[in-house]
Swiss-Prot record:
<dbReference type="GO" id="GO:0005737">
    <property type="term" value="C:cytoplasm"/>
</dbReference>
<keyword id="KW-0464">Manganese</keyword>
<comment type="pathway">
    <text>Sulfur metabolism; glutathione biosynthesis; glutathione from L-cysteine and L-glutamate: step 2/2.</text>
</comment>
<keyword id="KW-0460">Magnesium</keyword>
<dbReference type="Pfam" id="PF02955">
    <property type="entry name" value="GSH-S_ATP"/>
</dbReference>
<dbReference type="InterPro" id="IPR011761">
    <property type="entry name" value="ATP-grasp"/>
</dbReference>
<dbReference type="GO" id="GO:0004363">
    <property type="term" value="F:glutathione synthase activity"/>
</dbReference>
<dbReference type="InterPro" id="IPR004218">
    <property type="entry name" value="GSHS_ATP-bd"/>
</dbReference>
<comment type="similarity">
    <text>Belongs to the prokaryotic GSH synthase family.</text>
</comment>
<dbReference type="GO" id="GO:0046872">
    <property type="term" value="F:metal ion binding"/>
</dbReference>
<feature type="binding site">
    <location>
        <begin position="150"/>
        <end position="207"/>
    </location>
    <ligand>
        <name>ATP</name>
    </ligand>
</feature>
<keyword id="KW-0067">ATP-binding</keyword>
<protein>
    <recommendedName>
        <fullName>Glutathione synthetase</fullName>
        <ecNumber>6.3.2.3</ecNumber>
    </recommendedName>
</protein>
<keyword id="KW-0317">Glutathione biosynthesis</keyword>
<keyword id="KW-0547">Nucleotide-binding</keyword>
<keyword id="KW-0479">Metal-binding</keyword>
<dbReference type="InterPro" id="IPR004215">
    <property type="entry name" value="GSHS_N"/>
</dbReference>
Length: 317
């Protein structure tokens, strides 16, 4: 029997209709795996050995009570076959410390999804810089004058911090926006922080598509997040609405261009954000949208993920 750990935000406060981590655990349970639940404060190092206080959890698809802990124990993380790192951003120093603890278990043979080093290496906004031919025209800088020159050149641009999630602090700045200086000051913290500027992709009105890639294989369906009226952000957290749809040829082309690099880096479960024919983000920390896609189409994305984990465990054995 496979022992699967999961590090996540408190299970008591998830929305089971939308939560991808819950979907993953349900699939693991269906396979008879033993699921060890952890939060960040359950991870420790003791003389270089990764230790975890875990709770074995049973799940049911019931909005009145979706989980029950059946036992609690302190174990070496390496006793688990695999661990899903599903803690939501912020990607802060605490998150980074947790990846080091997970890496110690990885060195003893535990499969960590996604690979700790790659979680540190692949910032969700910046990692797209490795695929410039697929992205909107982009600069990353702290300097206000560079951002202003970029806007001068391109007219309609998007400004965003490198560490936001759910559409937080994303600004659209048009040609004669009187607020441009204060937006730049806010985002760069008066030149102390890097910010990203990108050309605006008008196709956002048709949705910001979330494409899931499992162990190098793009899933054939995506969730298009349509911005609320008058909004430029499709994120569900910013009031967008989700519309599951099959991948277009362009979507598939973009996903196939990125997928081999993801697989090679041990990024087994990744969410690509695509607007029109442009890649805007590569989400590696805890991508979501499984539930919405699985509800609309005859596909088990979680099944494919657990198959990939089984394959990798067999290859390691």
């Amino acid at each position: 029997m496979i022992k699967l750990g999961i590090v996540m935000d408190p299970i008591s406060s998830i929305n089971i209709k939308k939560d991808s981590s819950f979907a993953m655990m349900l699939e693991a349970q269906r396979r008879g795996w033993e699921i060890h639940y952890m939060e960040m404060n359950d991870l420790h190092l003791d003389q270089g050995i990764a230790i975890a206080d875990t709770k074995v959890v049973q799940l049911k698809e019931d909005p009145n009570g979706w989980y029950e802990f059946t036992s609690e124990q302190t174990i070496e993380l390496a006793e688990l076959d695999a661990v899903l790192m599903r803690k939501d951003p912020p990607f802060d120093t605490e998150y980074i410390y947790a990846t080091y603890i997970l890496e110690r278990a990885e060195e003893q043979g535990t499969l960590i999804v996604n690979k700790p080093q790659s979680l540190r290496d692949c910032n969700e906004k910046l990692f797209t810089a490795w695929f410039p031919e697929l992205t909107p025209t982009t600069i990353v800088t702290r300097k206000a004058e560079k951002i202003k020159a970029f806007r001068q050149e391109h007219g309609d641009i998007i400004l965003k911090p490198l560490d936001g999630m759910g559409g937080a602090s994303i600004f659209r700045v048009k040609e004669n926006d009187p607020n441009v200086s204060v937006i730049i000051e806010t985002l760069t913290n008066h030149g102390q922080n890097y910010a990203m500027a990108q050309t605006f992709v008008p196709d956002i009105s048709n949705g910001d598509k979330r494409i899931l890639v499992v162990d190098g294989e793009p899933m054939p369906y995506c969730l298009a997040r349509i911005p609320a009226k008058g909004e430029t952000r499709g994120n569900l957290a910013a009031g967008g609405s989700g519309e599951p749809r099959p991948l277009s040829e362009t979507d598939l082309k973009i996903a196939n261009a990125v997928a081999p690099t993801l697989k090679e880096k041990g990024l087994i479960f990744v969410g690509l954000d695509v607007i029109g024919d442009k890649l805007t983000e590569i989400n590696v920390t805890s991508p979501t949208c499984i539930r919405e896609i699985e509800a609309a189409f005859d596909i088990s994305i979680t099944g494919k993920l657990m198959d990939a984990i089984e394959r990798r465990l067999q290859a390691q054995a």
